[in-house]
């Protein structure tokens, strides 16, 4: 299997290298691609050093079987035809193609089969907050159809990339040394000791693009008419996102039956003993593969409502891991060139 990583120097690109090694992904040859800024950098994979090649419009992808692409929407749009020209499967981490009808949007625990129909050779990886939420919603949907979901997300700095993590750390350092944060470029405001109730650009409805992604992507992945309403907030933690989720189902569900299906669900770890201070926290889910869920309880305002809390590493399951799992599924069913 010949594999490429486009955007190898970024936070998700680096996570691809770790996950592919950890899972012993079947790679005979690995090629790393990047922009002019990262071309020439060297990274080690399974004891061997690889140099990042400049991404160009040429025949570099002619013999590539799978390309993991995490270099931003504009790069995905510009190079999609170049990458897929000779039959390479492009698994794209950007938002560029997610809502296009001829591009499947896939979370393997839910709709892996959708990846088999890809007329453009592209499979889209969903938004990180969407992935973590639907992995938890799907087992509940099997108990009773979910009508509405309301979410407040608490998203760490790493969701904005490696440079954003560095900026947050730099802000804390500056505050300790001088009393104020001087480095503010990756976020619209100081993030250290703060929360920012905006992720991505505002739309004309005053919902952000991040919040609208959750609305549309959830419906597409789950093949459902479920309606979601989200408030996405950037918080001053480094890694791992959290979400407070309110779920309205067609019929009332007992907490015990929800716990039971979540405990058995693939990709989910139940952490739910709040009387003993046991519940999911981003500090503990960082670096882990599963989505952690707890604080499961009946909603006090709606007899058909359930509320819960989840956390997950958005660079792993929210990005690189989900893409690798898609590729593993394609290999398992023999659906790669």
Positions of the model-derived regions?
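N-terminal Rossmann-like NAD(P) cofactor-binding subdomain of oxidoreductases
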Residues: 1-191, 227, 260, 291-292, ...
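Charged docking surfaces used in two-component/phosphorelay signaling
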Residues: 67, 157-337
């Amino acid at each position: 299997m010949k594999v490429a990583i486009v955007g190898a120097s970024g936070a998700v690109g680096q996570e691809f290298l770790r996950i592919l090694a950890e899972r012993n992904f079947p790679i005979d040859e690995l090629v790393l691609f990047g922009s002019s800024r990262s071309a020439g950098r060297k990274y080690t994979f399974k004891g061997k050093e690889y140099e990042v090649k400049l991404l160009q419009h040429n025949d570099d992808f002619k013999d590539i079987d799978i390309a993991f692409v995490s270099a931003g929407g504009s790069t995905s749009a510009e190079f999609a035809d170049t990458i897929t020209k000779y039959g390479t499967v492009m698994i794209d981490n950007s938002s560029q193609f997610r809502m296009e009808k001829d591009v499947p949007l896939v979370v393997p625990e839910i709709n892996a089969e959708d990846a088999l129909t890809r007329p453009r050779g592209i499979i889209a990886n969903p938004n990180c907050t969407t992935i973590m939420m639907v992995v938890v919603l799907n087992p509940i949907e099997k108990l009773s159809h979910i009508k509405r979901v309301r979410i407040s997300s608490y998203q760490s700095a790493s969701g904005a990339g490696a440079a954003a993590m560095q900026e947050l750390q730099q802000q804390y350092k500056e505050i300790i040394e001088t009393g104020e944060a001087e480095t503010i470029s990756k976020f619209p405001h100081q993030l250290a000791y703060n929360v920012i109730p905006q992720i991505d650009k505002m739309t004309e409805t005053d919902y952000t693009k991040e919040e609208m992604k959750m609305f549309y992507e959830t419906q597409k992945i789950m093949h459902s008419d479920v309606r979601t309403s989200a408030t996405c907030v950037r918080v001053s933690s480094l890694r791992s996102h959290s979400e407070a989720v309110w779920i309205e189902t067609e019929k009332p569900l007992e907490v015990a039956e929800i716990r039971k299906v979540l405990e058995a669900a693939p990709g989910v770890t139940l952490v739910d003993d709040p009387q003993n201070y046991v519940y999911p926290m981003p500090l503990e889910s960082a670096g882990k593969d599963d989505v952690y869920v707890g604080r499961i309880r009946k909603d006090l305002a709606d007899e058909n409502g359930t509320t819960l809390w989840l956390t997950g590493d958005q660079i792993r399951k929210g990005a690189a891991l989900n893409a690798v799992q898609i590729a593993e599924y394609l290999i398992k069913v023999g659906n790669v060139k």
